[in-house]
Structures are given as structure tokens and as C-alpha cells.
Design a protein with these regions (language model features):
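N-terminal, non-cleaved signal-anchor transmembrane helix
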Residues: 1-29, 33
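Transmembrane helix-loop junction
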Residues: 5, 17, 54-59, 91-95, ...
């Protein structure tokens, strides 16, 4: 239904031109670029933090109550409404750290939103690798770090990448976090700095629909 009703107005000009006439005309190019910037920024934050945390939890952390508690808290973070992350991002990044409404603040907030998913995906990917590979690598004289870097991570990377793609899919559709941290109502020019505001497709759709 959406494709049937919308295909008549979707063309190259609509996709590559800025909005005009107070959002009643023009296209969505700045919103596309802004969404892309936010996805890249959140990935640059969430991927290293989430993957390294997942590696530590699965490969280094001693099994016990503390690890179980951290896993429970990580799962709970996945269930927190996105608007709570938005308010937290506004308080921490926009106000306390002084980033203001910016791509940087929005990217970090969205990164926090998807870190739990990346952690859990990384853990599950590493758990699926049989211990025989670890034992064989160690028996050949490799250190634990070398085993993780050259044996475990390459085997688990496809599933880890899948988790990152799922996280980016969630990030690309979130409105509440960027509402408080970076989204601009009408900004036909493309942002030139990570400390500038940007338009974004989820917020743009919200504005148009309301």
C-alpha cells in the first residue's frame, strides 16, 4: 500500500533536493544525509565498545555472580524505552558535556542505545564457536590474545556483523533520542561539522505526519 501510494512522487529530484517552502515542497536529501551521519557515528561508538565488552564477558571475565549480574543489566538496557535514552543523552551530552544539539550528541546517544544489542550478539557469536578451536590454538603455542584475534574473531565476525546491521537498523528508525539531541526541524543545508544539527528521516517523517 505504501509503495503503491508513494511511488508516484518518489523520483531522483525528490531524493536529491532539499526541502523548501516551509517543509511543504522540495525533497529529503538533507534528511537522508543526516540519517547516514548518525548511523556512521553511532556505529563508530557502539561497535568497538560492544565487541570489546562481548569479548571480555565471554573470553576473560570469570564465571560468577558479577558476570551474571552484568548480563542481566545488559538485557535490561535493551528493554529501556528509547525516549529514556534521549533524555539521558540530552542531560549528559547536550547539557553536561556541552556538545549542544549536534550530530556528535545524537550519535553517542544512539550508540548507547544499540551497545547492549552488539554486546549480546558478540557474546552469542563467540559462544557458538567450539572450545576445541581455542584449545588447539593454545596447544600450538599461541597466546590467549592471539587466539582471540586470529582464530575466534574471524570465525565469529559474520554473526557479529549481522548484529551490528540489526543495531543500525534500529538506530535508523529511532525518533525520540534524536528529538532531544540533534534533530533540526528545517535545515536545507548539509551539516559541515559534527557539532552542527542535522535533519533525519525519522524526525522528518514525524514532523510531516503531525
Amino acid at each position: 500500500f505504501i509503495i503503491y501510494k508513494g511511488i508516484g512522487v518518489i523520483n531522483w529530484k525528490f531524493l536529491t533536493s532539499p526541502p523548501s517552502d516551509g517543509m511543504t515542497g522540495g525533497g529529503i536529501w538533507p534528511a537522508i544525509v543526516g540519517t547516514f551521519y548518525l548511523m556512521i557515528g553511532s556505529a563508530l561508538f557502539a561497535f568497538p565498545v560492544g565487541v570489546m565488552s562481548g569479548i571480555y564477558m565471554n573470553e576473560y571475565a570469570p564465571k560468577g555472580k558479577l558476570v551474571r549480574f552484568i548480563r542481566v543489566m545488559t538485557n535490561n538496557l535493551s528493554g529501556i524505552p528509547s525516549i529514556v535514552f534521549g533524555l539521558f543523552g540530552m542531560a549528559l551530552f547536550v547539557k553536561y558535556l556541552g556538545f549542544g544539539d549536534s550530530i556528535l550528541a545524537g550519535s553517542l546517544t544512539l550508540g548507547l542505545l544499540c551497545v547492549p544489542l552488539v554486546i549480546r550478539t558478540t557474546e552469542e557469536a563467540l559462544k557458538a564457536i567450539p572450545d576445541s578451536y581455542r584449545e588447539g590454538s593454545l596447544a600450538l603455542g599461541a597466546t590467549k590474545l592471539q587466539t582471540i584475534r586470529y582464530v575466534i574473531l574471524p570465525m565469529g565476525m559474520p554473526n557479529i556483523i549481522t548484529g551490528l546491521i540489526l543495531a543500525m537498523g534500529r538506530v535508523s528508525g529511532e525518533t525520540a533520542p534524536i528529538l532531544f539531541t540533534c534533530a533540526a526541524y528545517f535545515l536545507p543545508q548539509l551539516p559541515t561539522s559534527i557539532l552542527a544539527q542535522c535533519m533525519a528521516l525519522p524526525y522528518h517523517l514525524y514532523v510531516i505526519s503531525t
